[in-house]
Amino acid sequence: LFAADCANIYLEAIMSIRPVKKLIKSKPTMEGAGVHLRRAFGFGNTSDYDPFLLLDDFRNDVPEDYLAGFPWHPHRGIETITYVLAGTVEHGDSMGNRGAIAAGDVQWMTAGSGIIHQEMPKGDPTGRMHGFQLWANLPSALKMTPPRYQEVKSEEVPQITDDDGTHVRLVCGSFWGKKGPVEGIAADPVYIDVSVAPGQRKSLPVETTRHAFAYVFAGSGKFCNASGPLAVPTEGVGWLETVPPSEADNRSLILFDSGDEVTVQAGDDGIRFLLVSGKPLQEPVAWYGPIVMNTQEQLRQAFTELEKGT
């Protein structure tokens, strides 16, 4: 065995591998003024993903499917994390901020007490647009915090390459001794973009106290020692097929159970995925559209204030 393989086996022997709890295929939907995208999770069982609420994969080569964008709309009580891989997202808000999120960039917006903004995607020279938007819930004590942005350019995102060639872009949190550029986030999340070479097996630490999920957007692989068909609940992965999937491929979301590490065995084409974890808030969720509060009364109050312009 190579030294890296021996090290991985040793680490797995002393750590607890997180089993796969659920495998989900992201589902096509439309948002904004008619943007075609895929939703990995959202508007469902929030407790499994707490403190996260929603993950959208906006990936398209047809400009007509995304150029209408996301015109002016409100948010309150959440944080939105936009990570762009191709193309650009131009944005503006009710506080007078204007800017653009280009390939490799990250924008972390804390909506807090309320903000109205717009996000308008523009493709790269080939017409391609690709990115992700993740929503993170704010704890009750910070629901009405003043809105703010953290904008990170691609060159500011730490990149780590392990001895076996595994490559990580560190969007947020601490990982492998490095610290990401986004700070002061209530859920203390770790958000990484991971690339593993073909056939390579890799173990990645995740704190036991966190909820964690992965989202595959290139290649395929087996997570957490899955040796056969995944005997876990699946959604959107071929209801008419008699044999459940044995690995996670493009546009698959993997929700993990408890443990302190995630393992992946990359397929023949390698694998690239987001790995996201955060500390659960364990608070009530009252959610309607772009506004997330703790009670129905708070939700009604938010929409009343929005209608009055206050």
Where in this protein do the model-derived segments appear?
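Jelly-roll (double-stranded beta-helix
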Residues: 2-310
